[in-house]
């Protein structure tokens, strides 16, 4: 029957049981506490009533004592033998004590009466208090009016005795109530003790019952489950797991049984997979060894190619630098030729200016020659006139002769100068023609140098492009060399990984060999052991993590 009850239901029943016990014990203790509270309230009420009533009684007795002293003082004053306090002081004191007694009694009446107190006794006490209080007030009035005989004739002692008798009866009643409350409190305490004992016994019985139920429902099945789990942890999968209940423990046993069956299938699959992985890893390791040697050869060839490309790159860079310098020299020669052409053009222009100036000088010389010719004619005419004049014109004839000689010499000099200037003009014209021819030649030289400069610039540009292209080829070869080196490293790492995979497959097979299956009986599964060794290049290579392998393969 217990095997059909769910664990949750059992726990709920336990909680309900202990909750009911808690409520019952709480109710009993609350009832006892309530009774104790009521008894304590009665005791506190009686104590407060007695305290206030006792204080009021004492105040009344003190007021009567003060009035007696005042009456005696009044008689002594009449006989003129009095001393001490005056009558007025004693009367004032008596009034104050009566007022205090009234306040205490009023406070006493404000306290609620216990239902178990006798209302007749309370009413009688009130009447006797009122009589005594009124008598004492009347004594104060009589003594204040000087009615000493009426003062002493009043039966105050009888009123006091009646009040005392009623007061004592009231105290006896309260004493009985006090004792009843004490007895009730003791009885409540005893009941609480017995209730506690009974509750403890019931709780202990419930605990024993709950423990037995838990041991039957939870502990023993869980111990069986723990034993099965320990056997599974040790690799023993041959023991069946029984399912004897339909509660949570039964569900746990069924789940554990399902887990054992799945684990049996998993171990079988892992063993087969480990064997397959071991075989594949061995083949991968052999292939990686061959690939590693070929990759190393390829890396060596690429390294030689990279060195040759570096030398070719250096040579092309030198040619490009020489072409660049030749282009700069041609450009400088072109600039120099252009400057020479400009100088020749200036010379041509200057020769033209000289020819123009020589022509002007020839014109001026012609003018001088004409002036000399006219002067000669004038001198000849003067000589003729002097001859006609005879002796008187002899001196004028001499002067005219000298002028004629000078005119002839001037004409001769002008002719010679004209001839020289004409010859100079002819030579200047010839020089101008030659200079113009030289200017044209310099222009041709400048054009030729410009074309040479352009050609050298194109050669330098082509050399630069060729140098950059060879640089790019060199970089590509260097990158290929670097990638090949990385590939060689990756191949080595792959070979190491294959060897490690082979070793891990062997370890995995050995690990799953711990489990014992029903089909094997007492035979022990033997895992293959790796006896291959990695090549020297792989053995010296540093092991890396699986993530590094993946990153390197992505680079490859």
From Swiss-Prot:
PROSITE patterns: CHEMOTAXIS_TRANSDUC_1, CHEMOTAXIS_TRANSDUC_2, HAMP. Residues 64-73 are annotated as: The 3 Arg may form a positively charged pocket, which binds the alpha-carboxyl group of the attractant AA. InterPro entries: 4HB_MCP_dom_sf, Chemotax_Me-accpt_rcpt, Chemotax_Me-accpt_rcpt_Me-site, HAMP_dom, MCP_chemotaxis, MCPsignal_dom, Tar_rcpt_lig-bd. GO terms for molecular function: transmembrane signaling receptor activity. The chain crosses the membrane at residues 10-30, 192-212. It is a multi-pass membrane protein. One of its GO terms (cellular component) is plasma membrane. It is found in: Cell inner membrane. The keyword Membrane applies. Residues 31-191 are periplasmic. Keywords: Cell inner membrane, Cell membrane, Chemotaxis, Membrane, Methylation, Transducer, Transmembrane, Transmembrane helix. The modification Glutamate methyl ester (Gln) is found at residues 297, 311. This is Methyl-accepting chemotaxis serine transducer.
